[in-house]
Amino acid sequence: MEKENLAKIACECLNLDCPEPDLSDWKSMVNDLRHPDKEVRIALVGKYTALHDAYISVVEALKHGGIPEHATIDIKWVDSEELNVDNVDEVLGDVNGILVPGGFGLRGVEGMILAARYARENKIPYLGLCLGMQVSIIEFARHVCGFNDAHSIELDPNTTHPVIALMPDQDGVCLLYTSDA
């Protein structure tokens, strides 16, 4: 757009001064985006991984986060319902980081908890967003603190070790999902 003088034309139409823009930072960022010198593999462990657009904001944030590090981000899509103790090493053994995004309902949560445990035990960087952060707390309570049935009240109202509770202002709010969401 700069080559087409769009900014200059717009400024003239609006009777504004149009100083010459300094695009050096922009050009540097575009160069970094187009010419990364490394690849970082991130496992995105969720329950909606068949629908990549469900996580579009997370994907774009990862891509943009790679730019200043001169890195391209390779996302390994992991269905949390399919992740289990028999395949966790094979599925997550080749990643540089694990991200568990938000979600709703109980479906796939045990796979997310397993991913959080794998990250902790193997010293792999982990980022939990919303439900992803909650499952990391559940994992820690179960496997480090020894509260074997630790859970979120939202997901298991009968747990004897509730490590995630509903906020008081959420009490009585109808759930917008079912347990298999």
Show which residues each predicted segment covers.
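C-terminal lobe/tail of nucleotide-utilizing enzymes
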Residues: M1-E60, G65, H70-E90, I164-Q170
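Generic recognition of cysteine residues
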Residues: C11-C13, C18, C130, C145, ...
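Flexible gly/pro-rich beta->alpha loop and the following alpha-helix that scaffold active-site loops
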Residues: V59, K63-M133, I138-H151, L155
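C-terminal, non-catalytic macromolecule-binding modules
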Residues: A150-L176
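Conserved small/polar residues in nucleotide/adenosyl-binding loops
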Residues: Y177-A181
